[in-house]
Each structure stands twice: as structure tokens, then as C-alpha cells.
């Protein structure tokens, strides 16, 4: 066990984490030259296209160090984006050390700081690594100082490397061997194994990636999942090199995969503990918490024939993604669909893109909302993740909205504009620190403001240099109202949203104007209104098309013309009463994108 090293890499998007892991695999001959490709561990197409890591992966490599000994390096790849922070905390729970990889040209980013604190809280050895030192404008000394000032770990003598051209990769491996502590655990104790990740394979069923904390698990043995108590038999186990390599057993300290013919992903929940069925341990590995979705949205198929395929696609996706929540929902405007819960906006975009790309579905997504708490006058508290659950306005004593603590890191030139957008988004400043060239700004912001378009606005005002990390801290009473959209007097449920009362008129006017441009002209007038309760706050009218009914009268008597015009007027009146307005797809999308 003393020659095992379990570590993961903490890095911001684009700081070179996946490239560095490629180099590790090359140096340790994990794959032949022919099998190597860029970003080996990012297995989903969407991961490679967007250049981000979404799912945690693992690789076991044998490295012969300069001291002549061979070490087993278990490297668990982690995502860098704030939406996937639970994936990160799980991966860290399986390690003894973490490499903090920072781009020597860009410096420290907010999400890196957040993940780094998670690692420090879990008592991991954090080792700073400065990557991309081959870039002409790399400033390793300035960045090392930033790491010390912002994160508070000693970065003097931090290992420098360039993963892209392969300089210093062996130095990094030597640093891992020297500084990451060997795992603790007892091979002869009762089995305790943490499930780091599970995914569904069409041939094998559920494949679980586990870190054995204590004991040994062998092929053919029976084990049980602690939270469900269900027992399974091990069909296959082994390690990824990154290819699957079968072994007879996994012992304390090792990281590998287990296949036991489990058909349902919820049979092996991520973060759960496995133990022997006949001689179980009493206590699970700490750190298992159920993931709560933060953002909810309705998803609907454009053609109702696709509904069964959509359900199947969601079930398959949720096999791989334990944090995706869904339940059936019916909307008057959009038909049958599902109410889905996500970790954040990026998570939502990725799920939608995977559904459209991997399962060929055409989807509409309704406006994302967060979970509000409605406190009724009789004291009952209702969690509102869907407007249909909101009680009547008369029955509500107060509505509470979720508040997040946002930590923003920006270069000091942009502080003014960042503070301006935070104030516009109803933020309250908590802290502001100057650290070298960077400024760390902490604000308490309503979550709905953060999930709608805060990240995009932040990126545009800071020219892409701002970075953001946030976590839910509390609920606060807020003056929220439900903004309905009426078209010809009929409510369109898919366009309704919860907004702050101060912004309701402005949001209503903006929404109505946008819909006016998108709803095609009909043979009759179409009234578009935004309303709060019974009060109309904005209105716009799509003018009617008019057929020239007098074209066939050459000259002739005026009363004849009047008769024709009156007849047209009557017809339009009747049409308006019975005619329904088709709202085009773009209208929904444009409202939701805003």
C-alpha cells in the first residue's frame, strides 16, 4: 500500500488539466502511440467539443520513479465547472492529494479557489503546479504569489511544466510520488468501498468506479450497497489503464471498477458505500450527500409522437447522471413533457444538447426557475419549483427566494462594472479584497438572477477574465409576484414567470414587445398582455391583416361598399371570438433566452 498514490487535479476550465492527464498516460505507457488521442479521458463528444470535463473518470498507471521503485498512481479526473462541484467533491473524497493546476499566464480563477478549499477541508495534500510555462507571456512568479495570497498555500518552489509540449511532466510525477501521502486503510478489515461514479453500459449494466478504503473485494463475492441494503455478486472487477483491465481483486487503497449486473443506476447511488454481504461494516464512508437540483425547467418535445422516446432518453441519461431529476408535466401550451431539475444552467444546456444530439429529439425548454418557498397564512410551507404549485395570491403570507453567496475574481480594471451588474441584480456586497492584480469580490445575490444570465453578463463586462463560483446559503423573504402572459385574454402557462415586484412592469413590457415581433399577423387583432394577478401591466397589439373586399366593385353605389365592409367587420368579430392564435416555436425560445 505504501506505493499507491491517489490524486486528482483541480483546475479551471482551459488551464490544461486534460492535456496534462494525456501526458501522464504517455509517460507511463498507459496506451500505445496508436491509441493516443487528444483528451483521452473526455469520452463524450460534447466534452471534447466544448473542451470541458463533465464526468469524473479514473486511470491507474504504473510509474517507475527515479528512486527505482514502481508506484501505482490512481488519477481521478474531475470537472472544473461550478455546476459540477458535487462531482469534484466526490472525486476528492477518494484521494489523498490534489494537484492544483494553474495557468501560468492567466492566474487563479474563482472556481479553482472553491474546489481547492473543498480539498483542504477534506485534509488533502494540495500541490501547486504551474502549467503553460512555454507561453511567451507566462509569469510563474506572479501566479505563485497569487496562489499564496488568494488560497493561502505555500507556492514557493511550485513545480512548473508545459503539458502541451511535454516539459516538466516527469517532475510533476516525481512531486506526486514525493508529496502525496500513501493511503491509509487495513486490507484485513471489513470491506468499505466508496462509489465515486456509476454509469450504464448496454452490455454490462451499471459499471461503478470505486475507491476501496478498507478490506478487499474479490471476483465472485457478494457485496451489498449500504443505503439500499440490496446484495449483488461481483461479475468483473479491475482498473482502467485507461482501457478496462480485469483483475481478481481490489484491495484497500486502490481505485477500480466493479460490474455486478445491476440493471438500475439507483441500485448503486454515487457517493454510497459498498460492503460485504456476509460480514458488513457498521459505518459508511463519510461524505455521501444527496444532490439537490438548484434549477428547474420544463422540457417538451415539439412533436407529441416523440414523447415515449423522450421518456426513454431521459431514463437512459439519468442512468449516467445521478443529479438529473425529472417528473412528468403537462402544459396547456406545449403539451406533454417533463419537469427536470439541474445543478445549474450549464448542466441544463448540456443535458438538452445530449438529448438532441444522442437521441435525435427536438425539444423546447420552458423558462428556468429556482425553488422558492411560499409560506401560506396558515403557516404551511410549500416548495415551489413550478408555477402551478404557487398558491392563490390571497393565501400567501410571504414568498422566500434562495440567496447565493457569489465569489467573483476579476482583474482590478473591471471592478466598477462588476459592482454595477451586482447592484442591478439586487446584490448585497459582503467583502472586497485586492490581491495583487486580481480583486476578490463577494456578494449575496438572489439565485434566480445568477442562473438567468449573470454569468454571460459577467464574462462580457470583464472581457472574459471574470470568474464566478457560488453556493446556496439561505432563503430570504422577497417581494416576488407571478407575471402572467395573456394572448387574446387566454393565459399561456409556458410563458409565466416569477419576478421581483420592482422589475415586474419593466419585464412585462419587454416580454410583450418581444412577443409582438414574433407572433405572426392574423386575420384579426391579437392582444398581448402581461398581468400581475388581475392588474394588466403592459399591453401590445398585433394588427390584423386586411383583405380588400372592395376590389370587385368597379365604381358603384356607396351603400353596396358599406354593406361589404360591415360584413367583413362582422366576420372579423366572429373570428376573434373563435379563432385561436398559433404561437410559433421561436416566440417561446426567444422569451426563455432573453
Swiss-Prot record:
Enzyme class: hydrolase
A Pfam family recorded for this sequence: GTP_EFTU
Membrane topology label: Peripheral membrane protein
Residues covered by the tr-type G domain: 2-184
UniProt-listed GO biological process terms: positive regulation of translation
Signal peptide boundaries: none
Claim: Plastid is one of the keywords in the record: no
GO molecular function, one term: GTP binding
Subcellular locations according to the entry: Cell inner membrane
CDD domains (alphabetical): EF4_II (cd03699), EF4_III (cd16260), LepA (cd01890), lepA_C (cd03709)
Keyword Hydrolase: yes
Binding sites annotated in the UniProt record for GTP: 14-19, 131-134
Catalytic activity, reaction form: GTP + H2O = GDP + phosphate + H(+)
Family, per entry: Belongs to the TRAFAC class translation factor GTPase superfamily. Classic translation factor GTPase family. LepA subfamily.
Full protein name: Elongation factor 4
